Amino acid sequence: MATDHSGTATAKALIRLAGPAAWARRIAQFAQIAAAGPHVRRAVVQRHGLELSLDRIAKGAVRVPSAAERRVLDLARETVSVYATLPPAGRERLRALLHACLADDGTLIPLFHLMRTAALQRDRGFSVAFTGLAEGTPFDLLLERDGVQAEVACDVVSAEDGRGVHRGAWVRLMDRVDPDLQTWLANHPGRYLLKLTLPQGLRRDAADQDLLAALHDRIRTMLSAQRRADHDEAAVLRLDPLMLAGAQAGELGLLNSLRQEFGHEAHLAVTECGGGVFVMAARAGRENEVAVAIRRRMAAVAPARLSGTRPGILAMFIEDTDRAEWRHLRERLELEGEARQFLTFPEARSVVAVTCTSRLELFGATAPDGVPEGELRFRNPSHPSAKAVALAPAVLSSV
């Protein structure tokens, strides 16, 4: 068989598992969603980069895959290989998982997180069985090394669950507001900064669509009336001149400067028209609690997914985060603190270790953006198997 240097055959094989018609519909859905505006379009490309990359590769649009694309292809190849080893019921479960990944707001992350977790443990000397797929066990993987077994439950948690202002809602607001800002700049040349504080938050669910429309109307009314401030219990808005040094004039320099001023939690957007610049910076009324949301998810997953008859490992994938936030969670020890707190809870009785990873590690990012060894690990010192030598490569704390 010819070597698949471009990855085309691998990508096509995964698409055949999904069903070519279902895959084509999914790619078409991305185009429909992206038509909402440029901010939503960028968000779609970022969130669904796995699917879009595989689609381009399958169509022969990528002659030489990048390092990140090669990692994606490795996971696609692993998926196809695992499918071939499964019994009929297991193959149906894998197809069902793949179809769920391609439905609604889903991505391939749950499937690829499972495959990547298995590959990491094999590289550490464990034999790995896909019992969740093959047998329908609540946990996903059964590890064994030197006669000692451990269960692994893989789960994906969105950083949005810990944010007061969802990025998904923010990009939709920006696409609503951007034409108004263009008009404003055309009639009022200059540099402006609109700061928004949203005490009640802004989420992407249907319940907040009315709030999104109301906030858009308030911004438009504020600009048309040339007011500098507006506030109520839902939002505090303030319009100020934007002060720029020479080095900050470009969009990249401006965003870096604003990020330093407002912090990693701020939602930022820049609109330009002619020589005018309009910046919007939004924050919730309280600090984000991403690490807290992860801890709550772990407390829900552990008793539901681990049998309690063997040492259990929770393999958590942190989705919808970025470089700045991921580094903040690690460097400020927020993630470590919440993980270690969880390990003291009754729900963690069967958990010997927790691992955490993100897209940065999946795509091969190195320190300081990515985590060495591909994941953070936190061992539960109170678990009876915490010091088991056979389990050490999978459970020893990485920090």
Where do the protein language model's features map onto the residues?
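Short acidic loop-to-beta-strand element that houses the catalytic metal-binding Asp/Glu
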Residues: 136-153
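Charged, structured surface patches that assemble and position nucleic-acid processing machinery
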Residues: 1-124, 132, 156-399
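A short glycine-rich beta-strand->turn/loop micro-motif centered on a GG-aromatic cluster
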Residues: 129-136
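Secondary-structure boundary elements
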Residues: 120-127, 145-148
